[in-house]
Amino acid sequence: MEIISLKRFILLTVATSSFLTSNTFCTDEFMMPHFHSKEGDGKYSQLRGIPKGEKERSVSFQELKDWGAKNVIKMSPAPANKVPHSAANLPLRFGRTIDEKRSPAARVNMEAGTRSHFPSLPQRFGRTTARSPKTPADLPQKPLHSLGSSELLYVMICQHQEIQSPGGKRTRRGAFVETDDAERKPEK
């Protein structure tokens, strides 16, 4: 199957849409005189024209004004600052609160309770600040059996070497090191 390029696809789409819409424009009364002769125009005007028994009438300004008033629906804009009663006392997003509505005494009590329950971030992550020194009781206790980073790295390397040479064979790297050492020794 052949793949159609984008330009050809667009050209095909435009041609198809213009062909399909040309049929609808041709049946319109305004386009007929351009495509047909004046002889056939009478036939179309009789079919689509105004019946001979009715007269055209113009709409007066008063009728137009009355018609417009009946069909227009007036909508008031929604109030922007209206808050539902149930959500009036809730804090705003991201922990901000409206301070104007609270008394100073209530604000002090709330701040004291928050400080005791939630330490500041430097305290939580083991860093000390100048204003709040830590006591040894506040410091996280390190388990006695945990290894230091250098000891842990040494254990991992030893296990890796045991996996690489399980039968006591030396690894390639060890053999190269010994060869280099033998070459460096002076011959006697």
Curated annotation (Swiss-Prot):
One of its GO terms (cellular component) is extracellular space. One of its GO terms (biological process) is negative regulation of gonadotropin secretion. Residues 1-26 form the signal peptide. Keywords: Amidation, Cleavage on pair of basic residues, Neuropeptide, Secreted, Signal. Coiled coil: none annotated. Residues 116-144, 163-188 are annotated as: Disordered. The keyword Signal applies. GO terms for molecular function: neuropeptide activity. It is found in: Secreted. InterPro entries: FMRFamide-related/fGRP. The modification Phenylalanine amide is found at residues 94, 125. Residues 27-57, 97-106, 128-188 form a propeptide. Belongs to the FARP (FMRFamide related peptide) family. This is Pro-FMRFamide-related neuropeptide VF.
